[in-house]
Design a protein with these regions (language model features):
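A short, structural micro-pattern
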Residues: 1-5, 99, 140, 179-183
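Secretory targeting and sorting signals
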Residues: 2-31
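Cleaved targeting-peptide boundary
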Residues: 30-41
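Secreted/periplasmic proteins that engage bacterial cell-wall peptidoglycan
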Residues: 40-155, 188-189
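Catalytic micro-motifs at enzyme active sites that drive phosphoryl/nucleotidyl and oxygen chemistry
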Residues: 90-95, 170-177
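Short, low-order "capping/linker" segments at domain edges
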Residues: 151-172
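Conserved, short, structured surface segments that act as functional micro-motifs
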Residues: 165, 172-191
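Low-complexity, Gly/Ser/Thr/Pro-rich intrinsically disordered linker/tail segments
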Residues: 182-206
Length: 206
């Protein structure tokens, strides 16, 4: 049997295992006690967030915000791929890259191994948790939308899979692999997620 195929399968199973651990294990240490003050609403501090609404760039913050960096570093260190949180100068059109809320996670859509990583990640973040919360991990991470391999998944549409074509392209055929997001996965966060203020970041901000 092809050894490269076996290695690919082994890596994919390892990734699935890591994601399963992430879904099942709380971020905070087990010996930490929950805060005594729940804000007066009888809800735990880690209550799941609602779906992120669309928040366009309105401020200039060209350096990635702390939550953006934490999520980007987790993606590359635990799941593979490259790239990460990316900032951009604030001139020109609007972009979440320009206010520190965007990740460009380097994955190659022509690579079977990278497609498996992307598929496993999307399956995990869009899964329903044990409490019945749909798209639970994406909501806890503060994911606003994802673009990957000619498709977009938006929180305000409950992460329905929609076709995507960059406004800079007349057709897929005339569109670059970067604008088609076939050489990276773009992840935009809500401002709360980018600042590390949603529940997934609890215990991960040290």
């Amino acid at each position: 049997m092809d050894l490269s195929y076996l290695r690919s399968v082994s890596k994919f199973l390892t990734i699935l295992g890591l994601i399963a651990v992430l879904l099942l294990a709380p971020a905070a240490h087990a010996d930490e006690e929950p805060p005594a003050d729940d804000g007066g609403n009888g809800e735990e501090a880690s209550q799941i967030e609602d779906y992120a609404s669309y928040e366009p760039q309105t401020t200039c913050h060209p350096k990635p915000r702390v939550g953006t960096r934490v999520l980007a570093e987790w993606l590359t260190s635990e799941l593979g791929g490259g790239g990460g949180a990316t900032g951009r100068a604030c001139g020109g059109g609007a972009s979440e890259h320009k206010d520190g809320r965007a990740i460009d996670w380097t994955l190659n859509a022509t690579s079977q191994a990278d497609r498996k990583i992307a598929k496993a990640f999307l399956k995990a973040v869009f899964a329903t948790d044990e409490e019945g919360n749909t798209h639970a991990l994406a909501r806890r991470m503060g994911i606003m939308y994802v673009i990957w391999n000619d498709h977009m998944y938006s929180a305000w549409d409950e992460f329905e899979r929609d076709g995507y074509l960059s406004s800079s392209c007349k057709s897929k055929r005339k569109c670059s692999k970067t604008l088609r997001h076939r050489d990276h996965m773009h992840i935009s966060l809500s401002m709360a997620g980018a600042k590390g203020k949603t529940s997934w970041y609890e215990g991960r901000m040290d």
